[in-house]
């Protein structure tokens, strides 16, 4: 019995809610017919509302109002307009994906999210490169294995986001890639981030030609590092006190017996 009463209560509540919704819709439709579609007085607003709610047996006024509402609907409703907008966005994204390959598939969502979080002001469009550097930081450096894509990454971002002309940056990137092509292949994006003077670059090239990759693979042994920590500057002073190669040779000529007896031990 309690369940039946609870069910009846819920039905009454739902019925009242539906009735209020229907009354609101009928009032809106009849008001539109009475005051916007025809001249005032041609359609009675109260009679139209009662017929719409089903409280009157006749439905002539309501039928007339429905016909007027059907005729007054736009040729392209809001839903159709939204569908056209969505289709246009899809076409644009398809064209971008076709033009730039997998770049938009890989980074498109990230760029859109960053644009929503940090919109570009009109007065900041002139400084497009600085804005891109602040927004994306070292994001494009992760793509170092793709070669030419890394060299033109900032130009591609400027073109996609519409921040301005990128001809100057293209020329600059081409020069930098031609000069550091060999270093980029060997070290990836590591050497590209270091700014060195011409003198240091020449010395590095000479060392590279002379020793190749040997000095990079072979470092100081662990025992030498332990001695360095333990004795500090004592080893440096001891090394300075050692004779040079020329002094050692003259010393060996003057004292041949010691040289024969101890060999090269006395040199150290």
Curated annotation (Swiss-Prot):
Cystine bridges: 26-48, 30-52, 33-65
Post-translational modification remark: Proenkephalin-A is cleaved by CTSL to generate Met-enkephalin. The N-terminal domain contains 6 conserved cysteines thought to be involved in disulfide bonding and/or processing.
Signal peptide per UniProt: 1-24
One Gene Ontology cellular component annotation held by this UniProt entry: dendrite
Organism in which the protein naturally occurs: Mesocricetus auratus
PROSITE patterns on file: OPIOIDS_PRECURSOR
UniProt subcellular location: Cytoplasmic vesicle, Secretory vesicle, Chromaffin granule lumen; Secreted
Spans annotated as Disordered: 162-185
InterPro entries: Opioid_neupept, Proenkphlin_A
Location, primary (coarse class): cytoplasm
Protein name: Proenkephalin-A
Family to which the UniProt record says this protein belongs: Belongs to the opioid neuropeptide precursor family.
GO biological process: chemical synaptic transmission; neuropeptide signaling pathway; sensory perception
């Amino acid at each position: 019995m309690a369940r039946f009463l609870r069910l009846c209560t819920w039905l009454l509540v739902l019925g009242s809610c539906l009735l209020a919704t229907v009354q609101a819709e009928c009032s809106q439709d009849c008001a539109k017919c009475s005051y916007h579609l025809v001249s005032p007085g041609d359609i009675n607003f109260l009679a139209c509302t009662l017929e719409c709610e089903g409280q009157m047996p006749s439905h002539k006024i309501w039928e007339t109002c429905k016909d007027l509402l059907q005729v007054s609907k736009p040729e392209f409703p809001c839903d159709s307009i939204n569908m056209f907008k969505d289709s246009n966005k899809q076409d644009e994204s398809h064209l971008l994906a076709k033009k730039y390959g997998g770049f938009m598939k890989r980074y498109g969502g990230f760029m859109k999210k960053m644009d929503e979080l940090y919109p570009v002001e009109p007065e900041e469009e002139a400084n497009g490169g600085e804005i891109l550097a602040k927004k994306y930081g070292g994001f494009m450096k992760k793509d170092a294995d793709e070669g030419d894509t890394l060299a033109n990454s900032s130009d591609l971002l400027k073109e996609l986001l519409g921040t301005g002309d990128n001809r100057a940056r293209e020329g600059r990137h081409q020069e930098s890639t031609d000069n550091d092509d060999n270093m980029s292949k060997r070290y990836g994006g590591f050497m590209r981030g270091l700014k060195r003077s011409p003198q240091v670059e020449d010395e590095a090239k000479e060392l590279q030609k002379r020793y190749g990759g040997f000095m990079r693979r072979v470092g100081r042994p662990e025992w030498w590092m332990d001695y360095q920590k333990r004795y500090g500057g004592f080893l440096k002073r001891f090394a300075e006190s050692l004779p040079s190669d020329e002094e050692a040779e003259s010393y060996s000529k003057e004292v041949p017996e010691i040289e024969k007896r101890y060999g090269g031990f006395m040199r150290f």
